[in-house]
Amino acid sequence: MNPVCVQGGEYSKVRGSHSPYGDAWDYVKNKEGILKFWEDGIKRSVGHHVFPTVGMRGENDSKMLGEDSLISDNVRLLKEIITKQKEMIHTYLEKDEKTVPKLFAVYKEVEDYYFGGGTEEGLRGFEDLDDVTLLLCDDNFGNMRALPEKFERDHKGGFGMYYHLDYHGDPVSYEWVASTPLNRIWEQMTETWEYGVRKLWIVNVGDVKFQEFPLNYFMNLAYDFDTWGSEAPNSTGAYTEKWIKDTFGEYTSEDERREIRDVLEGYLRLNGLRRPESLNDTVYHPAHELECERILTQCEILEKKNESVRQILRSRGKENAYYSMIYFSAAASVNLLKMQLYSGKNHLYANQGKAVANLYGEMTEQFIKRDEELAQEMADFKNGKWAGMELASHIGFTNWNDEDWRYP
C-alpha cells in the first residue's frame, strides 16, 4: 500500500540529485525529501474523497531497513513516520473539524513490525493507530493469516482485509485464469467478517478478464453479506445459479444453464486443487489409486459439456459472453491438466522401459499444440477484442515467476 496519497512507483519518476524529493527512497538518509514528496501528494488530494495510507515499506515491497534489521528499530522508525504523516493529513485534509479515514496495511513486509516478535514489541496498541483502519492480509493464496483477537475487536479505526484472487510473487505467481473456487472465498471471508473485519475489504484481482465470476461474487458478498454471508452456508451454488441466469438467462434453457454451472464450478474446482502455474506432472500419480484416471474422467466430462454449450450458443449467435468469460478458461485449464497427466504417464512408463510411453508422449505433444491453438483463438476472437489476455505464462513454473517456464 502506498503512503499518503502518492504511488510508490511515482517516486522513481521524480527522484534525482537535483530533485526537491532527493534521490533515495529512504526515510533515514532522505527524511526531508521523503516528507516533501508525501506533503505534495496530500496537497493535490485536497477536495477529493481519499482514504490515505500511513506507514512505509522499502522499495519494491521490501523491508525498510533491510532483512537483517531489528524489529525494534523498524518499529521506532515507523512510529515517527506515522506521527509525521498524520500531522500532514490533519493539516491539509482535516480542516474545519472534518476527519478522513486512514489506513495502515499490515502486509507481509510489515507484519513483524505490527505484531512484534519474541521480546520485541510491535506497533500493536500504538496510540497513533487508534483511529486508523488496520488492513490485514491473507497469505496471498486466499487463506487467512491473522484475524483480530477479542481484546482488539473494538479498535476505533476498525479492520480491513486484503484478499487475493491473483498474485505476483513468491513462492509461485498465479495470474492466468480464475483459480479460486467460490466456497473458499465464502469460507475465508465469512470467517473474516465474524472476527470483526468489517470496515474495508480489498480484493487483488489482477486482470478483470477471466476473473469476472469470482470478482462478481466477492463484491456481492461484501455488498450484501446478509444474503450471501454467514447466515447462508452452502450458498455458493445458489449464487452461481443466479449469476448464470442473470448473465445468460435470456437465451438459455434451465437445462443449458445447469450445464454452464457444471462447467464453471468444475474448472474452478480443478484449478483450486492445484493452481495451473504450480501444476506439474508429479502432482497426480499416474498409477496409484487410479488418481490420474479419476481426474481424467472429470476432465473429459467437463470438456464435452463446455464444447456442447459453446456450440449451442454459437448456433444462436450468442457465444460471445460465454466464450470470453467461461469457455476459454475452462477449455485451456482442462487441456493443461490433461497435458500434465499424460506427461506423468509418459515419464512413469518410460522409466519402466514400456513402449506405451511413446503413445503418452505423443498425446502430451498434442495437448501442447492445443494450448497454443486455444491461445491463438482467444487472440483472434471478435477481431482481437481480448488480444493479449491469452499471453500470460501458465505452464511448468520453475521459479516464483514465469522465468524458465517449460512444457513438460
Task: Locate each region found by the language model.
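C-terminal non-catalytic alpha-helical accessory regions
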Residues: Y239-F397
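Gly/Pro-rich turn-and-neighbor structural signature
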Residues: K31-K156, H285, E289-Y322, I326, ...
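Feature activates predominantly on carbohydrate-active enzymes
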Residues: M1-E32, V46, L123-N143, K150-P181, ...
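Short secondary-structure boundary/capping segments
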Residues: N2, S19-D23, D68-V75, G117-G122, ...
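Aromatic- and acidic-residue-enriched carbohydrate-binding clefts of CAZyme catalytic domains
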Residues: P3-D73, G157-H168, P233-E241, D246, ...
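Flexible loop/turn segments at secondary-structure boundaries
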Residues: C5, Y11-S17, Y21, E59-L65, ...
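Substrate-binding cleft of secreted/luminal carbohydrate-active enzymes
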Residues: P181-L264, S343
